[in-house]
C-alpha cells in the first residue's frame, strides 16, 4: 500500500530547475532540507487519507511546497477533512521533536521547518490553514457562504502577504509562491459553480447519513454534515426531492 502510493509522487518540472539553481548558488543543502520537510508534511496528509481509506490521486512535489490530491467527496465528514488537513503540520512537529530528541536539529532546519509550518497555516487557498478555516466556517454557515468567506479571506491575507514581501522581505521564491497562490485562487473562483453542483449532485446520488437535520428555504442554505428539509410555502419536502427536480430537469 505504501509503495503503491509512493509511486503516485509526481515531481513538478520547476523542481529540477530550482535544484539546479540551488546547486550553482551554494544553497543545495538548504534546498534538500526544505524538500525533506515538504515530503514529511505531505506524508502526514497521505497517512490520514489512508486511515480513512481515501484514494490518493497524486502527490505533487513543487520547488516551494507540496500538494496531495485525494479522490474524496466534497460531502466527506468535516472531522475527517480536518484531520487530513491538520496531519501535515502535525507530522512536521513530530519530525522536529524526533530530530531534537536525537540532537540533530540545526538552525537551517529550524528556520525552514518553522517557516513552512507557519506559512502553511495562513488562511490562503489552497493552504492547510485555508482548509482548516473553511471547516470552521462550515460549522457555522452554509456550504456556499463558507466557500466565499474563505475565498475573500484568502484575498485579504494574500494582499497583506504581498505587502510584507514588497516592503519588508523581498524574496524571489516568495514572489513565485504568491503567483502560484493567485493562480489557484482564480481557478477556485472560476470553478465555484462546478464545485457547488458537485456538492449537490453527491447528495442526490448518494445516501449520506447525517445525525443533524435543519429546515431551510432553498438549496443555497445547505450545510455540510446536515441533512435538510426545504420549506416551500406551506409545504415541506426533503432535499432529495428538490435535488431530483434540479438534476432530472438538467438531464432531460
Regions found by a protein language model. Give the residues of each.
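Hydrophobic transmembrane alpha-helices and their immediate loop junctions
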Residues: 1-252
Amino acid at each position: 500500500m505504501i509503495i503503491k502510493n509512493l509511486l503516485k509522487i509526481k515531481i513538478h518540472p520547476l523542481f529540477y530547475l530550482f535544484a539546479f539553481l540551488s546547486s550553482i548558488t551554494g544553497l543545495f543543502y538548504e534546498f534538500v532540507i526544505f524538500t525533506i520537510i515538504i515530503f514529511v508534511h505531505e506524508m502526514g496528509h497521505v497517512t490520514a487519507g489512508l486511515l480513512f481509506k481515501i484514494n490518493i490521486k497524486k502527490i505533487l512535489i513543487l520547488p516551494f511546497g507540496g500538494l496531495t490530491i485525494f479522490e474524496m467527496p466534497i460531502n466527506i465528514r468535516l472531522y475527517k477533512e480536518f484531520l487530513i488537513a491538520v496531519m501535515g503540520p502535525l507530522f512536521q512537529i513530530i519530525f522536529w521533536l524526533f530530530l531534537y530528541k536525537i540532537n540533530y536539529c540545526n538552525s537551517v532546519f529550524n528556520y525552514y521547518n518553522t517557516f513552512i509550518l507557519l506559512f502553511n497555516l495562513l488562511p490562503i487557498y489552497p493552504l492547510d490553514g485555508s482548509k482548516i478555516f473553511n471547516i470552521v466556517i462550515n460549522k457555522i454557515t452554509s456550504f456556499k457562504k463558507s466557500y466565499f468567506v474563505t475565498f475573500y479571506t484568502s484575498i485579504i491575507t494574500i494582499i497583506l502577504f504581498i505587502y510584507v514581501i514588497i516592503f519588508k522581505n523581498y524574496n524571489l521564491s516568495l514572489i513565485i509562491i504568491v503567483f502560484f497562490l493567485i493562480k489557484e485562487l482564480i481557478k477556485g473562483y472560476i470553478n465555484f459553480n462546478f464545485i457547488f453542483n458537485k456538492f449537490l449532485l453527491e447528495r442526490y446520488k448518494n445516501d449520506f447519513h447525517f445525525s443533524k437535520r435543519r429546515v431551510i428555504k432553498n438549496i443555497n442554505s445547505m450545510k455540510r454534515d446536515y441533512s435538510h428539509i426545504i420549506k416551500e410555502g406551506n409545504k415541506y419536502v426533503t432535499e432529495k426531492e428538490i435535488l431530483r427536480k434540479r438534476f432530472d430537469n438538467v438531464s432531460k
